[in-house]
């Protein structure tokens, strides 16, 4: 009888920790915003590094020999320089490149 009680208690504790971790993760996801707006040039910066303009397997927008290096979920270190339908297709390689793309004049004649 004692082993059944310990098994039941262990299962109850496992369910408790599972539910509480889901609740904490949900609250953390609602309150945290990793993307912040850089005050200098208005580019979204998330503070994380990235492999800019490097093709590689396993990264969105990259691939063997193709370059790209865009990211679907994480964002880019210095902002996005080429946006596509599903998000960023190419990350900027330096901080001023995103601003250069914004200020380039393209005549519509």
Curated annotation (Swiss-Prot):
It holds the Pfam family GRP. Transmembrane segments: none annotated. One of its GO terms (biological process) is defense response. Induction: By tobacco mosaic virus infection and by salicylic acid. Its main location: secreted. Keywords: Cell wall, Cell wall biogenesis/degradation, Pathogenesis-related protein, Plant defense, Secreted, Signal. GO terms for cellular component: extracellular region. Belongs to the GRP family. This is Glycine-rich protein. Residues 1-26 form the signal peptide. It is found in: Secreted, Cell wall. It comes from Nicotiana tabacum (Common tobacco).
